């Protein structure tokens, strides 16, 4: 009854108006699962391949009809008849069928859509919430959200080199409280920016994209917004950034165009470290470029005992690359993006490896998103503890937050918000200093 009987795919649009793949998997029992695949703007060079048509006369070359055809052709032929409850078998079938290291023959967007839709169909067949199907009886941890409230870099047309400035409501008692604290800070920040004559348009992930003097001014605005919203910076709401340093790493230097600086990797480490002394900055993602492993080792040596250092572009959710990083002493946390690796099974393997090595895990969206909220269930199902899914506006971002509210309600008093554990893990109880 849980046997896959049909697979369907279609081309839909993501939050940037670009095509992406949506897949539906139907079972013999009549249960179905649907999943839509996100897309990134700043991407790691070793990510699994997102297949695009390349026809400039249609969606400016970004159509995904080839990926859709692959789902409804080769992939459907291979997985119809398989048991949806055997996720590993389904995903291994996809991997064998593709036969490449980077999913370049069938496309990671085609494969991931099928993989996630299969999991949804299986959870529906069993009558279980997706988070419980993914994680079992011990799925109970509500993640701390890393809320992107100021955008720069590749995500916004302004003079900020750092791609994301985020807030983390670590002092909340529940996820519901954390969401409220974040929303109140977001709206306070909007008012502060508007009062000073800054544009309050938003970037791809819903954060504001003002032209500011420098990065310190961005931090100061956020600190003021936290305080005027009635919260204590550091103790109740901490700060995080995604530098996305690969985007401005050129010829061995970190070119901070907005600040007129060209830094070596050691100077970049020092520059980032200075922010941690001035502000309650507890998490830095992609502080160095993906190819700069020497810089990453230095960053980890100098800051890894006190703050979270998240590897995104350097690891691309790949268990083999993460294993290298663990051996090399690089970072202490990994960003998990489903479409970087292309199947649910490989994603779960990466998360398990990270936990075994005492690396924290941050489940993440992409800048090109849909209304699909699979990552919310994944974050709770795997007790990941953190989720990065954008700002407090745009329905594609709020869909994930709202699903977490539903999950927390479903868990009732058995749910645990990760904020206090995040504080104790890195020792962030003290209020940060400006």
From Swiss-Prot:
UniProt remark on cofactor binding: Binds a second Mg(2+) ion via substrate during catalysis.
Record has GTP-binding as a keyword: no
UniProt xrefs under Gene3D superfamilies: Enolase-like C-terminal domain, Enolase-like, N-terminal domain
GO molecular function, one term: magnesium ion binding
Pathways per UniProt: Carbohydrate degradation; glycolysis; pyruvate from D-glyceraldehyde 3-phosphate: step 4/5
Cofactor(s) listed in the protein's UniProt record: Mg(2+)
Residue ranges with Basic and acidic residues bias: 47-56
Enzyme class: lyase
pH dependence: Optimum pH is 7.8-8.1.
The UniProt record lists the keyword Lyase: yes
InterPro entries on file: Enolase (IPR000941), Enolase-like_C_sf (IPR036849), Enolase-like_N (IPR029017), Enolase_C (IPR020810), Enolase_CS (IPR020809), Enolase_N (IPR020811)
Main subcellular location: cytoplasm
Matches recorded under Pfam families: Enolase_C, Enolase_N
The entry's keywords: Cytoplasm, Glycolysis, Lyase, Magnesium, Metal-binding, Secreted
Stated induction or repression of this protein's expression: Transcribed when grown on lactate, glycerol and glucose.
UniProt binding sites for (2R)-2-phosphoglycerate: 163, 337, 366-367, 388
Location(s), subcellular: Cytoplasm; Secreted; Cell surface
Binding-site positions, Mg(2+): 242, 285, 312
Region annotation Disordered: where it falls in the sequence: 29-56
Complex and partners: Homooctamer.
Purpose: Catalyzes the reversible conversion of 2-phosphoglycerate (2-PG) into phosphoenolpyruvate (PEP). It is essential for the degradation of carbohydrates via glycolysis.
Family: Belongs to the enolase family.
Protein's name according to its UniProt entry: Enolase
Source organism per UniProt: Nitratidesulfovibrio vulgaris (strain DSM 19637 / Miyazaki F)
């Amino acid at each position: 009854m849980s046997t896959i009987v049909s697979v369907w795919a279609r081309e839909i649009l993501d939050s940037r108006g670009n095509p992406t793949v949506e897949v539906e998997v139907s079972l013999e029992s009549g249960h179905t699962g649907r999943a839509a695949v996100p897309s990134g703007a700043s991407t790691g060079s070793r990510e699994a391949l997102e297949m695009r048509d390349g026809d400039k006369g249609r969606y400016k070359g970004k159509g995904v009809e080839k990926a859709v055809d692959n789902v409804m052709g080769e992939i459907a032929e291979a997985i119809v008849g398989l048991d949806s409850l055997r996720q590993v078998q389904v995903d291994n079938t996809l991997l064998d069928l593709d036969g490449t290291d980077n999913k370049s023959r069938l496309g990671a967007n085609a494969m991931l859509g099928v993989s996630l839709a299969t999991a949804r169909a299986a959870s529906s067949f069993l009558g279980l919430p997706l988070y419980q199907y993914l994680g079992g009886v011990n799925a109970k941890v509500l993640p701390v959200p890393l809320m992107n409230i100021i955008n720069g870099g590749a995500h916004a047309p302004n003079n900020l080199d750092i791609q994301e400035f985020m807030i983390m409501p670590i002092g909340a008692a529940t996820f519901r409280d954390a969401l409220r604290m974040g929303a109140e800070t977001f709206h306070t920040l909007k008012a502060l920016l508007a009062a000073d004559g800054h544009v309050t348009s938003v970037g791809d992930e819903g954060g504001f994209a003002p032209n500011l003097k420098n990065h310190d001014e961005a931090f100061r605005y956020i600190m003021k917004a936290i305080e005027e919203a009635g919260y204590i910076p550091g103790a109740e709401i901490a700060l995080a950034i995604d530098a996305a340093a690969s985007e401005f790493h050129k010829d061995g230097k970190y070119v901070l165009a907005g600040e007129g600086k060209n830094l070596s990797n050691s100077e970049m480490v020092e520059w980032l470290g200075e922010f941690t002394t001035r502000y309650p900055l507890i998490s830095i993602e992609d502080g160095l470029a993906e190819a700069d492993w020497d810089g990453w080792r230095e960053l980890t040596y100098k800051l890894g005992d006190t703050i979270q250092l998240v590897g995104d572009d350097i690891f691309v959710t790949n268990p083999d690359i993460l294993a290298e990083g663990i051996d090399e002493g690089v970072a202490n946390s990994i960003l998990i993006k489903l479409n970087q690796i292309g199947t649910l099974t490989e994603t779960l393997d990466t998360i398990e490896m990270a936990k075994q090595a005492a690396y924290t895990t941050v489940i993440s969206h992409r800048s090109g998103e849909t209304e699909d909220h699979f990552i919310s269930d994944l974050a709770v199902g795997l007790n990941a503890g953190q989720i990065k899914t954008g700002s407090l506006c745009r329905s594609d971002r709020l869909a994930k937050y709202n699903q977490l509210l539903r999950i927390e309600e479903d868990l009732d008093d058995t749910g645990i918000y990760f904020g206090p554990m995040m504080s104790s893990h890195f020792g962030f109880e003290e209020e940060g200093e400006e």
